[in-house]
A protein has these predicted regions:
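Small-residue-rich hydrophobic segments that form or flank transmembrane alpha-helices
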Residues: 49-118, 176, 180-183, 190-251
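A helix-boundary/kink motif common to multi-pass secondary transporters
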Residues: 84, 138, 262-266
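Transmembrane helix exit motif
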Residues: 100-108, 131, 136, 145-170, ...
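Cytoplasmic-side transmembrane-helix entry/capping segments in multi-pass membrane proteins
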Residues: 114-122, 145-147, 167-176, 208-212, ...
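Interfacial loop-to-transmembrane junctions
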Residues: 254-274
């Protein structure tokens, strides 16, 4: 996807001055720093790319707030088309980790922590493997794989399939392994986990708490794996900081819109939006946006 180029200047609240080298200016690179020798918050992407990412963050959060799921299914294909999958996944991870922290106390209180721990044991193997794929696979191959996985997961969600029966440790760990692999590679681990626990016979409050607590733990695994793999740098951090308010606004707006449509209607709308995002994110369509 070719987006309009132009300078983007990021000035952090504590920044004392803006440092722009001539070489960086020629490349459209801008860096904000609190001191001449301190670490830089750098954005090398064009202004159009960053605006597109912020829009994708709002759009994804709007759907999540509206339907309770789907943020990664929308954000990852779109953001990957703009800046690449190696940047898109860490950005969503950082934003989501920060904005869901407030949900943890209640989740810890009501979750079945033994089951969550069992699933996390599978994720501790799956997440690093997925992160390794994200770090080493060619970007174009990753984008095709992400779009294909999103469409497959969408078909899975539309089918309405649920695991029926009490969760068993070997199944729980296996789902954690698969979800961890998807999360490490593209932050797409939600559908397998939700499908498994939603049909497991637990109360809705417990299921929701299990999911929140599990993803808090798997997010830590992803963060460590991404950090060790060199996938979280100053540019990712800078864009995540910019995207966080848009994501928060989207969540609030989506929650507000929830009462204005029937369950069938809003699920249909969300499924359509996910499909559009997956198709729009395909490398085959990059030339259409140039």
């Amino acid at each position: 996807m070719t987006l309009p180029r132009g300078p983007l200047v990021l000035v952090m609240p504590e920044a004392k001055r803006l440092h722009v080298t001539e070489a960086a200016r020629q490349e459209g690179w801008f860096a904000a720093s609190s001191s001449s020798s301190g670490p830089f918050l750098v954005i090398t992407q064009s202004f159009g790319s960053v605006v597109f990412i912020l829009g994708a963050a709002f759009f994804a959060a709007l759907v999540r707030g509206f339907a309770g799921f789907g943020a990664a299914l929308i954000f990852i294909p779109l953001a990957s088309a703009a800046i690449g999958p190696r940047e898109a996944s860490p950005i969503l991870l950082l934003v989501d980790m920060v904005l869901t922290t407030a949900m943890l106390p209640n989740a810890w209180r009501f979750a079945n922590r033994k089951e969550v721990g069992t699933m996390a044991a599978g994720a501790i193997v799956g997440v690093p493997a997925g992160a390794a794929i994200l770090a080493w696979a060619p970007a174009t191959v990753l984008r095709w794989a992400i779009c294909a996985i999103v469409l497959l997961l969408l078909a899975f969600l539309i089918s309405g399939w649920r695991y029926h029966g009490r969760p068993r440790p070997k199944y729980t760990a296996g789902v954690g392994l698969i979800a961890g692999l998807f999360s490490g590679a593209a932050q797409l681990g939600g559908p397998p986990v939700a499908a498994y626990w939603l049909g497991g016979g637990h109360e809705g409050k417990i299921v929701r708490s299990n999911i929140i607590l599990y993803f808090a733990i798997s997010s830590v695994f992803s963060f460590v794996s991404y950090l060790m793999g060199g996938l979280i740098g100053w540019e990712v951090l800078a864009i995540a900081i910019l995207a966080a308010p848009c994501y928060a606004l989207g969540l609030a707006a989506g929650s507000h819109l929830f009462g204005f449509a029937s369950e069938k209607m809003f699920r249909t709308i969300c499924f359509v939006l996910i499909a559009i995002s997956a198709i729009a994110g395909m490398p085959l369509l990059d030339g259409l946006f140039g």
